[in-house]
Amino acid sequence: MLIFPLINDLSRKIIHVDMDAFFAAIEVRDSPALKGKPVIIGADPRLSGGRGVVSTCNYEARAFGIHSAMSSKEAYERCPQAIFISGNYEKYQEVGRQVREIFHRYTDLVEPMSIDEAYLDVTENKLGISSAVKIAKLIQYDIWNELHLTASAGVSYNKFLAKIASDMEKPHGLTLILPEDAVGILASLPVEKFHGVGKKTVERLHEMGVYTGQDLLDVPEMVLIDRFGRFGFDLYRKARGISNSPVKVDRVRKSSGKERTYRKLLYREEDVLKELISLCQRVAASLKRNGKKGRTIVLKVRYGDFSTLTKRHSLEVYTDQTETIEKEVRQLIEEIGKIEKGIRLLGVTVTNFQT
């Protein structure tokens, strides 16, 4: 017996567009000498004392296992010949605006997820084109013809599947998932590929012996709800290709944060500071990637006994700089103290964004 009704609207036409290695692609476009070389957007560890994280990198760098949020030091160790570029985020914002202008030629139902990806509902569109695949091809053509950049696109009847589809053929790919194919495609995927299923949920699913979409299909609804609460029903629906989440035109990101849970409690100050610095770097990279600056820094600490404290401080100016965020977080952890209790979780968030 189903606890919640399974309602699936198959009439919608949703496109997910994801720019390919966006920041790095812009740099290669503007400096042709970089073509074919591994390019990393992030601080050069040879100039920053080994500090910094990778904001993004091109596909040549990804061939070495480099990815976003990796430390610049590790990226250099994997690929010493890589070219590090600190990044011009104002330029990236302007190109992102140009990409969004292209989207709006076809529909005003656009939900930006970040500077380089968005969902489009083209069920009803400005050009009266009945084929979502044709619209996706036109968008890819416009982006290449006008901006000399490539984008991957996924087309399906909901956002979840459109996102899955856009990840299936990169770069410059276009994948369509039809209703009759959805369950079979999802069944073949590892649960890590399910958008919205985080690392902790994946670990818990693995503990249940659930590794693929097919494994998830075989788990009764009540078992998932007992284990994951309301999110268990979402998992039950995802495995069946069901999602009715609308494209939210007014979506506004209000904060940017990262947190990490530790299986072994942290007791030493140097270990805590090392983790906090890493979190600050990742938050700053996320802010820059999304073109955001904030002025309120929030530190979250959860102890071994599961008690949780948060501390915040507001700056006079808006920032997206690692050094500024780190300075405030160091002050906040000093104010909180009590490291000797053992720390189970640390989190850093920047909010109160510049409008």
From Swiss-Prot:
Q: How does it assemble?
A: Monomer.
Gene Ontology molecular function: damaged DNA binding; DNA-directed DNA polymerase activity; magnesium ion binding
Query: Per the annotation, how and in what number is the cofactor bound?
Result: Binds 2 magnesium ions per subunit.
> What Pfam families does its record include?
IMS (PF00817), IMS_C (PF11799), IMS_HHH (PF11798)
Which positions does the site annotation Substrate discrimination cover?
F23
Q: What is this protein called?
A: DNA polymerase IV
PROSITE patterns, per database record: UMUC
One annotated Gene Ontology cellular component of this protein: cytosol
Please name the NCBIfam families in this protein's record: PRK02406.1
What is the organism field in this record?
Streptococcus suis (strain 98HAH33)
Protein residues bound to Mg(2+): D18, D116
Reaction equations catalysed: DNA(n) + a 2'-deoxyribonucleoside 5'-triphosphate = DNA(n+1) + diphosphate
Q: What class of enzyme is it?
A: transferase
Q: Kindly list the biological process annotations in GO that this record carries.
A: DNA-templated DNA replication; error-prone translesion synthesis; SOS response
Q: What's in the keyword line of the UniProt record?
A: Cytoplasm, DNA damage, DNA repair, DNA replication, DNA-binding, DNA-directed DNA polymerase, Magnesium, Metal-binding, Mutator protein, Nucleotidyltransferase, Transferase
EC number, UniProt record? 2.7.7.7
Q: Where in the cell is it found?
A: Cytoplasm
Active site located where?
Answer: E117
Q: Which family does it belong to?
A: Belongs to the DNA polymerase type-Y family.
State what this protein does.
Poorly processive, error-prone DNA polymerase involved in untargeted mutagenesis. Copies undamaged DNA at stalled replication forks, which arise in vivo from mismatched or misaligned primer ends. These misaligned primers can be extended by PolIV. Exhibits no 3'-5' exonuclease (proofreading) activity. May be involved in translesional synthesis, in conjunction with the beta clamp from PolIII.
Name the principal localization, coarsely classed.
cytoplasm
Q: What is the lineage of its organism?
A: Bacteria, Bacillati, Bacillota, Bacilli, Lactobacillales
Cofactor entry: Mg(2+)
Residues of the UmuC domain:
14-198
